[in-house]
Each structure stands twice: as C-alpha cells, then as structure tokens.
Amino acid sequence: MESRINWGIIGCGNVAEVKSGPAFYKTENSTLVAVMRRNEDKVIDFANRHGVANWTTNAEALIQNDLINAVYIATPPSSHLQYALRAINVGKNVYLEKPMVLNNHEANILVEAVKRSNVKVTVAHYRRELPVYLKIKELLDSNVIGNVISAEIQIKQTRNTNLIAKTEVNWRTIPEISGGGYFHDIAPHQIDLMCHYFGEVENIKKGSCKENQVSHQDVSGEVLFKNGVQFSGTWNFNALEDKDECTIKGERGSISFSFYTSTITVSKNGLIESYHYENPEHVQQPMIEKTVGYFLAHNSNPCSVEEAAMVTHIMDVFCGT
C-alpha cells in the first residue's frame, strides 16, 4: 500500500499555475515530482517557480517516469482521453481535468478502460468540495426548504465577459479541441453539481440549441431526476448582459446562488437568510486532498468517471450531438 502520492503534471498552463498546481505540494502525503509542457522555456520557468526538480517537454516521458505514481492531466480536452489511457496502461492513478473528455463516445471508452484496470481515476469537478457548495448540499440534505421540486440555471455572458479563463490561444472556441465552445468549458461544473445534489437521472431533453451549431453559443435543456426534481438550464454566450444564477425551489422555500460568487440566499416563510464563504487560495486544493485520500484508500472517490460520463452525456444531448 502506497503511503505517499508523487505527482506528475501534464500541461502547466493557467489552471495549474494557481488553481491546482500548488495544491499538489501543499497537500499532506502529496508531492509534485515532475511537470511537462511542450514549450521548454515555459516548463522550466514553471518548474523553477514551483520548486519542481524534474521537467520534460514529452508527455510519454512523464507518464513513464518511475518517480511518479499519479498523473494530473491539465491539457485541453482533446488530449484527455489519449493521456488518461496511457497513464492507465502503465498503472498510474489519474486526476483528470474537466471536461473529462470531448464527447459521450470518448467517455464510454474511458469508463470501460478504468473498469478493466486497477487504476484509480478522479475527475476534477472540484466545486463539489468548495465550502459554498458543501453548504448548499448540507441545506438540501437537511431538508431546509422541504422536498425539492425544481432547479434552474441561467447563464448569460457577453462576448467580452471576464468569467472565462483567458489563454494565449482561445482553444475554448475550437470544437476539435474543447468539444464545442464556452458551454463545454463552464457547464460541466454546473451540471455536475446538479447531478451531485439530486442523484440519478431519469430523462434528458434537448432545448433550443441549433442543429449543427459549431461552438454552441446558445444552449438549453432539461433533466428529470429519478427523485422527481425537474432541472432546466440555459446558457447564452452572446448575450447583451451577464447573468449567473441558480435557483433551487422546494415545498417550503428556495435556495439561490451564483457560480462566480460565494453567497447563498435562502428564502423561507417570508424571511431571507444569507451565507457567505471565501474560496481557498488554490480552489482545487480541497478536491485534490480528497483525491489523494482516495488514492491512498483513506476515503471514497470524490468524483468518478461514471459520474463525469453522465455530465458528458447530458451535455451531448443538450447540444444535439
């Protein structure tokens, strides 16, 4: 039984810089041993600033490195499946960025590969472990607003929004790399939370997404969960103004929150109660701590490939693909 997780990172870009990278060497029983990026100057710079002894420009070399026993894949989605399968093939556990893969077909391939192996794979739907979303789950589980009837997400973003992470090349709008567009960048977190809160899916309906729409600028759909909760979501990335809202309605009240602030509003019996939480410096650290615990057999998987595959399936249906 391993007593420590020695990580290698494939893809040392913006996400790994602050959101996730430092958490691998700040988490107990976890060390960042090696990093990979295709640009030599940039990978050396990353390694030097984060105190990482080993670097490479070759992903296969990192995967084969005997010093590491787990791989964090933080590349654009088009290479997620390729690198995950390679890591699984050599017996390395994997922490895989969202979206897990490009589409439902790739998701099925990965799910089957994990089933056939002894490797552990966690998907980085890290919002599950942030304080604000843990509080929402606590409120729902304690039946504060009674039995939940419905949940609605409304996301509107202008072309110049600052809610989307910026990169040198805007690969998020290139379907062959991202899977579709901005919807594929931000919706996985949001849809995953709905599945995390409400459980198994009964039925999925596509909404207004235009057929053959390349980058999915305007998407909507509905999900009926087996517990009776009706979810509806709309995403518009060419809106006149920004909107970011999720409202969960129950028999005795409602819970409202935003995905880009950390305030929860509970309305019940004519009274309003608010909760505010600060995110940790490295927002993925709570999820990475749970992932390390899972790899060391201390706790269950914080987000399985099967759970992430359902998110991918919902997105494919919403987009008509």
UniProtKB/Swiss-Prot annotation:
A GO CC term attached to the entry: cell surface
Pfam families per the UniProt record, alphabetical: GFO_IDH_MocA (PF01408), GFO_IDH_MocA_C3 (PF22725)
Keywords carried by this UniProt record: Oxidoreductase
Coiled coil feature spans: none
EC number(s) from the headed UniProt entry: 1.-.-.-
Chief location category: other
Induction: By ulvan.
Localization of this protein: Cell surface
InterPro entries: Gfo/Idh/MocA-like_OxRdtase_N, Gfo/Idh/MocA_oxidrdct_glycsds, GFO_IDH_MocA-like_dom, NAD(P)-bd_dom_sf
Domain of life: Bacteria
GO molecular function, one term: nucleotide binding
PANTHER family (alphabetical): BCDNA.GH03377 (PTHR43818:SF11)
Stated family: Belongs to the Gfo/Idh/MocA family.
Function description: Oxidoreductase that may be involved in ulvan degradation. Ulvan is the main polysaccharide component of the Ulvales (green seaweed) cell wall. It is composed of disaccharide building blocks comprising 3-sulfated rhamnose (Rha3S) linked to D-glucuronic acid (GlcA), L-iduronic acid (IduA), or D-xylose (Xyl).
Name used for this protein in its record: Oxidoreductase P35
Taxonomic source organism: Formosa agariphila (strain DSM 15362 / KCTC 12365 / LMG 23005 / KMM 3901 / M-2Alg 35-1)
